[in-house]
């Protein structure tokens, strides 16, 4: 049956099949080949020009977007054909695939499109590049390294396939991890080395500061016995009898320095003596505990004697006795035991002979002068201060030749003499402190009332 003549009528322009296949292919975005150039298929290039007299091959209307211009590249002049061109209705013969002989692409961001994420996923360039049959699919891989690089843990790799229709979700890297474990380890090593250098700088600064302060402390400790004797004597010369009688605080300040020096020195001697191991023989054990008990008693009496002697009312004789005589009694024995004797179990020896014997003799003379007459009080302070000053000068400038005694008996005699002098002095101080406290607080009467009395027969 013959077809009607209506099929020869021209097709309206708003018909969906108005544009031919060549026009539709011309409106598609250009493709890319292996060389990175944009080239249309030969079928589209052959039918891109409209032929006169054919209404179906007219140029596109104003509503259709114009074709994009071809971008120039460094491989513009190379001859390349696609391996699988689209079939053309007018060209029935199929072209054999031709392998491209283009030079290798220049290394850059376009040479490795599968290693970098696309900056604009919706662009036609990214879509056509991913759709090209000659390039592998663009796969974005993210490497996640363990938090503890020291442990032997294999890195887990998560691959996320990117589609040309779905947008890419960019995940920023963690600031605490790096993509290279060697870089991470070097960063940690630099941090540790910087911290160690800072700690070493602090330790060096502290050691240098301690080394600078050590001579100052040594100077203060050297002049402490001399100042402990002369300071109360100067206070006695500055203030009169009435000032000491009215002000207990002035009496406390006058006695604080000599008693504090003796208490500190005996406490240090007791600590150093107790730090050594206890000897095994019976004789050494007896000496060890006896000397420990004496040093501890001297420390306690020196601390407790400050308050009773400050509370006592000083008359004319007491205003000379407490500031002048007491420091000359308490300071020299403590100074001798701390500076001139090496108190170690089984190794007790005298380090300085001449000045130590002189100080011991001067202390005995002071005791004899004090108990004889009141007018000899100032001489005790003068003799003690001069002997201590000579000891300090001999240690600093070597005025006297320091040589130990020839025999062990002489060394033991000097040590025993010093200990006997210290025992007499601190026994007198302890008795005086108890007497003053009993006079003020009547301690003995209260103790007698508390203790049970014997029944009368």
UniProtKB/Swiss-Prot annotation:
Residues 74-94 have a biased composition (Basic and acidic residues). Residues 1-112, 157-183 are annotated as: Disordered. It holds the Pfam family DUF2463. InterPro entries: UPF0328 (IPR019081). Residues 102-112 have a biased composition (Pro residues). Belongs to the UPF0328 family. This is UPF0328 protein ECU05_0030. It comes from Encephalitozoon cuniculi (strain GB-M1). The lineage of its organism: Eukaryota, Fungi, Fungi incertae sedis, Microsporidia, Unikaryonidae.
């Amino acid at each position: 049956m013959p077809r009607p003549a209506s099929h020869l009528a021209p097709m309206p322009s708003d018909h969906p099949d108005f544009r031919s296949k060549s026009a539709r292919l011309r409106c598609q975005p250009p493709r890319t080949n292996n060389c990175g150039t944009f080239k249309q298929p030969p079928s589209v290039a052959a039918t891109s020009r409209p032929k006169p007299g054919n209404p179906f091959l007219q140029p596109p209307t104003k509503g259709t977007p114009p074709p994009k211009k071809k971008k120039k590249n460094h491989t513009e002049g190379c001859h390349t054909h696609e391996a699988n061109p689209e079939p053309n209705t007018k060209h029935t013969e199929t072209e054999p695939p031709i392998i491209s002989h283009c030079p290798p692409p220049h290394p850059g961001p376009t040479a490795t499109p599968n290693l970098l994420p696309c900056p604009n996923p919706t662009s036609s360039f990214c879509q056509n590049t991913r759709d090209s049959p000659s390039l592998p699919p663009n796969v974005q891989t993210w490497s996640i390294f363990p938090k503890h690089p020291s442990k032997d843990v294999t890195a887990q790799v998560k691959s996320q396939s990117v589609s040309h229709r779905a947008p890419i979700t960019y995940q920023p890297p963690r600031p605490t991890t790096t993509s290279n474990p060697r870089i991470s380890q070097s960063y940690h090593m630099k941090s540790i080395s910087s911290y160690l250098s800072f700690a070493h700088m602090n330790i060096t600064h502290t050691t240098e500061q301690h080394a600078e302060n050590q001579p100052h402390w040594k100077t203060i400790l050297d002049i402490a016995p001399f100042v402990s004797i002369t300071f109360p004597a100067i206070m006695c010369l500055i203030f009169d009898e009435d000032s000491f009688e009215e002000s207990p605080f002035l009496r406390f300040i006058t006695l604080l320095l000599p008693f504090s020096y003796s208490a500190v020195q005996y406490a240090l001697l007791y600590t150093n003596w107790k730090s050594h191991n206890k000897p095994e023989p019976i004789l050494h054990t007896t000496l060890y505990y006896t000397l420990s008990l004496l040093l501890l008693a001297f420390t306690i009496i020196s601390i407790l004697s400050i308050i009773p002697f400050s509370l006592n009312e000083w008359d004319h004789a007491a205003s000379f006795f407490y500031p002048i005589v007491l420091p000359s009694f308490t300071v020299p024995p403590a100074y001798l035991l701390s500076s001139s004797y090496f108190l170690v179990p089984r190794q007790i020896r005298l380090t300085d002979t001449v000045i130590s014997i002189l100080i011991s003799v001067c202390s005995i003379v002071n005791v004899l002068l004090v108990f004889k007459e009141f007018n000899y009080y100032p001489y005790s302070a003068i003799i003690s201060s001069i002997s201590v000053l000579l000891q300090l000068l001999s240690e600093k400038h070597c005025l006297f030749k320091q040589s130990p005694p020839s025999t062990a008996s002489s060394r033991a005699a000097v040590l025993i003499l010093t200990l006997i002098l210290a025992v007499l002095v601190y026994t007198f101080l302890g008795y005086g402190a108890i007497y003053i406290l009993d006079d003020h607080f009547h301690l003995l009467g209260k103790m007698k009332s508390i203790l049970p009395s014997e029944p009368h027969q």
